[in-house]
From Swiss-Prot:
It comes from Histophilus somni (strain 2336) (Haemophilus somnus). It catalyses: dUTP + H2O = dUMP + diphosphate + H(+). InterPro entries: dUTPase, dUTPase-like, dUTPase-like_sf, dUTPase_trimeric. Keywords: Hydrolase, Magnesium, Metal-binding, Nucleotide metabolism. Substrate binds at R70, S71, G72, N83, L87, I88, D89, M97. Belongs to the dUTPase family. It comes from the Bacteria. This is Deoxyuridine 5'-triphosphate nucleotidohydrolase. Its cofactor is Mg(2+). Pathway: Pyrimidine metabolism; dUMP biosynthesis; dUMP from dCTP (dUTP route): step 2/2.
Length: 151
């Protein structure tokens, strides 16, 4: 398992709330919590930026992290990420924040310590552009959205 440096920005982590861990041996994501001063409601159509109480420094340029929504919040309550996916570069060292968007028609209550998103580490390959005049022909060519049909 890869070691990632973490700074605990909220003293409740490690006492009232655990450091994020994998729930099962097959888990890909670490749950991030709302480390706020008090509970609040996210109104329909509203977006809130929420502290997780952590910052990380990945350091390895072959890794990045993504903040993703928790499936239950989106499917059952209409709570998704305001930026859809948060990308954490390997050289970022600031606080991990979660942008939550209530796309439902009902207010949604966030309590202190609620699990609101998940952090997943992913491999990164940096690429350099090679300028060409033409591409080698493929079967797909420039077929884009819906090119392969529905069935």
């Amino acid at each position: 398992m890869k070691k990632i440096d973490v700074k605990i920005l909220d003293p409740r982590i490690g006492t009232e709330f655990p450091l994020p861990t994998y729930a099962t041996i097959g888990s890909a994501g670490l749950d991030l919590r709302a480390l706020v001063d008090e509970g609040f409601e996210v109104q329909p159509g509203e977006t809130k930026l929420i502290s997780t109480g952590l910052s990380i420094y990945i350091a390895d340029p072959n890794l990045a992290a993504v903040i993703l929504p928790r499936s239950g919040l989106g499917h059952k309550n209409g709570i998704v990420l305001g930026n859809l996916v948060g990308l954490i570069d390997s050289d970022y060292q600031g606080p991990l924040m979660v942008s939550l968007w209530n796309r439902s028609d009902k207010p949604f209550k966030i309590e202190i310590g609620d699990r609101i998103a998940q952090l997943v580490f992913v491999p990164v390959v940096q690429a350099e552009f090679n300028i060409v005049e033409e591409f080698q022909q493929t079967d797909r060519g420039n077929g884009g959205f819906g090119h392969s049909g529905k069935k």
